[in-house]
Amino acid sequence: MAKLLLLIFGVFIFVNSQAQTFPTILEKHNSEKITDVFHKGNFQVTNNPIRVKRYEFSAPEPLIIISPKEAGVYPVLLFIHGTMLSNEDYSLFFNYIASHGFIVVAPKLFRLFPPKLPSQQDEIDMAASVANWMPLYLQVVLQRYVTGVEGDLEKLAISGHSRGGKSAFALALGFSNIKLDVTFSALIGVDPVAGRSVDDRTLPHVLTYKPNSFNLSIPVTVIGSGLGNHTISCAPNHVSHQQFYDECKENSSHFVITKYGHMDMLNEFRLSPIAVTMSLMCAQSFRPKATMRRTLGGIMVAFLNAYFRDDGRQYYAIIANRSLAPTNLFAEKKGFNFGFATTYAQL
């Protein structure tokens, strides 16, 4: 009996010491510019996106590349745009990510003239083709336009917004009809959407409606918009960020930028006509979009730094102290409990 009591006491002391350690670490590093991720990074970025036409450099789809100018080796982010949008509609957001030392590759999978309206499965396969293009040709393009810059495909992340967010999950989960020649090392869903409702989802069906069911062994974060499910709902309940996060496994994270809408990370100007229409249709905040881009971009940079640069200080600090973000933020991570609201609706 005495041994049992001693064991219980020892476990209590260990757990309590671990609970105290994390806030101490955060307090120590709060003075070390934790919020730098929420400001433009230190890297100068290519003045204009590198535009690669279809078949140019053997590219399977037209794409843009945004890169730091400074010679070096950088992680790569493959980003899939949202429903009927253009990759160019995100150029300011991509510049923000690149300014923190990342190369962004963003294919264009939809066009109005001449019409190109791919199915979701088509989009997944097209994105897979672009992923397979990168080992052979990304460096060729970079050498042409930015001397001394290299993409590190050992640190390749897949991401996407809206329908493109679902495509990113589908690609990571193996739903492509095209065998991948690359390995994704991280996954970021930006307000992913699987359809208009549970009964009206696009094919293939990625969501299973079973908790922790996604067969993913890589780090995952899901970032949603708080107004995405407001009328007119462009990210409806049960087919958007909360459901995707629920189906992720242990150690994944979830953020909600509560005061912003589904399209609020897009450029203010230089938008495609459909992007303008979609932005007006979806619930939006009318707050500065630059703040949305800083918050979204900062979370993504902190997440990628944690897993690609072995520096998780900013990532964990944001989860534990949401007030570090430029706007209202909900954050949670499976396996961690900081005593906050358990859903963003409770804020």
From Swiss-Prot:
One annotated GO molecular function: chlorophyllase activity
Motif residue range(s): GXSXG: 160-164
Signal recorded as keyword: yes
Glycosylation sites: N215, N229, N251, N321
Annotated effect of mutating C234A: Severe loss of activity
InterPro entries associated with the record: AB_hydrolase_fold (IPR029058), Chlorophyllase (IPR048264), Chlorophyllase-like (IPR017395)
Propeptide cleavage-removed residue intervals: 20-30
PANTHER family associated with the record: CHLOROPHYLLASE-1 (PTHR33428:SF10), CHLOROPHYLLASE-2, CHLOROPLASTIC (PTHR33428)
Protein's job: Catalyzes the hydrolysis of ester bond in chlorophyll to yield chlorophyllide and phytol.
Name of protein: Chlorophyllase type 0
Source organism of this protein record: Chenopodium album (Fat hen)
